[in-house]
Amino acid sequence: MATETFARLRFARISPQKCRLVADQIRGMPVERALQELTFSPKKGAAIVKKVLESAIANAEHNEGADVDELKVSQIYIDQGPTLKRIHARAKGRANRILKRTSHITVAVGEKVKG
């Protein structure tokens, strides 16, 4: 398998800033190690990124016939999705805006370079 295999999750209800904390931890890791890191991380983003990583691994196995032991997280990036704008009622007839941010998560797995 010379190419990378991708998996994407769009419109995930987590802010990109919080999700990037998790993504930065597993970038470049072998997939087995990355899955362990995500399994034991207490962050909400870890569970979401783990599902996308598992999907990328399954895509590599099914579509490319890749060996799981040879895969690593070659790329992972979190882009900002659309923001849901909500209001929060305050005193004296005022209102504050609440921004509910979304993320587009992209994970690419590729084979480790031998040598």
UniProtKB/Swiss-Prot annotation:
InterPro entries from the xrefs?
Answer: Ribosomal_uL22 (IPR001063), Ribosomal_uL22_bac/chlpt-type (IPR005727), Ribosomal_uL22_bac/org-type (IPR047867), Ribosomal_uL22_CS (IPR018260), Ribosomal_uL22_sf (IPR036394)
Keywords linked to the UniProt accession? Ribonucleoprotein, Ribosomal protein, RNA-binding, rRNA-binding
Look up keyword Metal-binding and say if it applies.
no
Gene Ontology molecular-function annotations: rRNA binding; structural constituent of ribosome
Q: Which GO terms describe its cellular component?
A: cytosolic large ribosomal subunit
Instruction: Say yes or no: keyword Nucleotide-binding present.
Output: no
* SUPFAM superfamilies reported in the protein's UniProt record: Ribosomal protein L22 (SSF54843)
So what family is this one in? Answer: Belongs to the universal ribosomal protein uL22 family.
Q: What does this protein do?
A: This protein binds specifically to 23S rRNA; its binding is stimulated by other ribosomal proteins, e.g. L4, L17, and L20. It is important during the early stages of 50S assembly. It makes multiple contacts with different domains of the 23S rRNA in the assembled 50S subunit and ribosome.
Protein name per Swiss-Prot or TrEMBL? Large ribosomal subunit protein uL22
Which organism encodes this protein? Thioalkalivibrio sulfidiphilus (strain HL-EbGR7)
